[in-house]
Amino acid sequence: MTGKITTLLFDLDGTLINTNELIIKTFQATLQEFLPDRVFTREDILPFIGPSLMETFREINPAHAEEMRVFYREYNLKHHDDLILEYDGVYEAIRALYEEDYKLGIVSTKMYDTIMRGLKVTGLDKFFQVVIGLDQVSNAKPDPEGIEMALSLLNATKEEAIMIGDNYHDIEAGKNAETLTAGVAWAIKGPEHLAQFQPDFMLEKMSDLLAIVRDEE
């Protein structure tokens, strides 16, 4: 493989695996526990998907942000395996990229152990050489630190890399790291929301990546 794009970095939640119901139910339980007098609809919760937990909880309830983070993680882990789903075609596309010797990595705002749990449940763990979680960086996306760390570990350059995600934090992180970027049309907030951040590509299905990287050769 001698193409321009050699390295593909992925967000996890909402990109590779469908954790939307898990995330929404976990937020609902956390908010009910700490803010029982306030009503949060699913639509209210959608903006919380993407930023780090502390960023979200400090904005909602700064006095109890750390307690909310702990409660969220405990609830999330308890219900994790029952509520995550695979997106159609993701496994096959990632396997094809792996078999064609592309360098594959994860850059997520989740903790490393939780990322690995999701990857193992869906059987994707064997395809990724590098996994960067929130506990491995000082600055979460959209800061480019995680992407730059992944590229260094993969011995890759920004010029040959693309960042793929379902949230503006992913697209902005890629732009800040000066890689190519791709949004996914199956993002819970919708492709129109993601398009306003001007990713270089918009994937209708994960297999679209195969055409993109082959076209760059």
Curated annotation (Swiss-Prot):
One of its GO terms (biological process) is DNA repair. Keywords: Hydrolase, Magnesium. It catalyses: diphosphate + H2O = 2 phosphate + H(+). Its cofactor is Mg(2+). This is Pyrophosphatase PpaX. Its EC number is 3.6.1.1. GO terms for molecular function: inorganic diphosphate phosphatase activity; magnesium ion binding; phosphoglycolate phosphatase activity. CDD domains: HAD_PPase. Belongs to the HAD-like hydrolase superfamily. PpaX family. PANTHER family: PHOSPHOGLYCOLATE PHOSPHATASE (PTHR43434), PYROPHOSPHATASE PPAX (PTHR43434:SF26). Hydrolyzes pyrophosphate formed during P-Ser-HPr dephosphorylation by HPrK/P. Might play a role in controlling the intracellular pyrophosphate pool. It comes from Listeria innocua serovar 6a (strain ATCC BAA-680 / CLIP 11262). The active site is at residue 11. One of its GO terms (cellular component) is cytosol. The keyword Iron-sulfur does not apply. The gene is ppaX.
